[in-house]
Amino acid sequence: MESHDEIMARLALAEAVAREGGATALSYFNRRETLVVETKYDLQDVVSIADREVEQLIASRIRDAFPADGFLGEESGLQVGESDYTWVVDPIDGTSPFLNGMPSWCVSVAVLRGDVPVIGVIFAPTYQECYVAALGQGATLNGHRLQVDPTRTLQNHVTGFGANSYVSPQQVGEIVAALLSAGGNFIRIGSGALMLAWVAAGRVVGYYEPYMHAWDCLAGYCLVKEAGGWYHPFNTEGDRITKGAQVLAVAPGAEADLRRIAGL
């Protein structure tokens, strides 16, 4: 019971900070032409003051409520905590769509207990959609229960796919060819976190990305699991939580095909 209460207390805060951070991000989105944009890893990996301010806001709220918890943010890195819980936050997943006036971006907030994602909240402000999940509590979208459809397959639905400059053009081509050869089709929107939420919502049958970070995927993983899907575990032990890895989440009807394509 104590563990349940701990999770539910953090769930309430996770949704609150995702919504508050999303409102701040949306205010920047509506005046994005004023933002100064910087590059990180390469010219396609961009960041602005909006990312940093939203992350600082969320981190501050978490620190005030649960000072012993750990925190990993895309912009600020890892602060190891003293409790069993670690918050994993992407303040704006889909910065490129965000900066270019497209709606496909979101705020992603996950909470780990040990190495298990026990809370996942993804808020997409432009759609006014809030996806919420907690261990054993199911997944919801704006309060409505989510459940993946077991009749959906690679062949009768669409698959989400993402890639970045960590993935070679040759590998991207091979994955796309394998998807199409298996009778599937794919979509890419620029936000892996949001596409993972779409797996839970049944909008795509699965999502695969060969190299993704914890802050992009862990909230979505919790959502997919609680909606009845499967995900490939992400190594969160020690500093592995800061490293990229393969990410796959999928509904049951497409699991075998997508695991084969991903080599998992």
Regions found by a protein language model. Give the residues of each.
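Short coil/turn connectors at secondary-structure junctions
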Residues: P67, S83-D84, D115-V118, L154-N156, ...
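Small-residue (primarily alanine) positions within well-ordered alpha-helices
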Residues: A14, A18-G21, G120, A139, ...
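An extended, acidic
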Residues: Q147-L264
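N-terminal subdomain of lithium-sensitive/metallo-dependent phosphomonoesterases centered on the IMPase/IPPase/PAP
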Residues: M1-I92
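Short loop segments at secondary-structure junctions
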Residues: L112-V116, T126, L135-G138, H144, ...
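DPxDG-like acidic metal-binding loop motif
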Residues: G81-T140
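Solvent-exposed alpha-helices and their adjacent loops that cap or buttress functional pockets
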Residues: T39, Q79-G81, G114, V132, ...
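Residue-level signal for inorganic ion chemistry
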Residues: A25, D51, I62, T95, ...
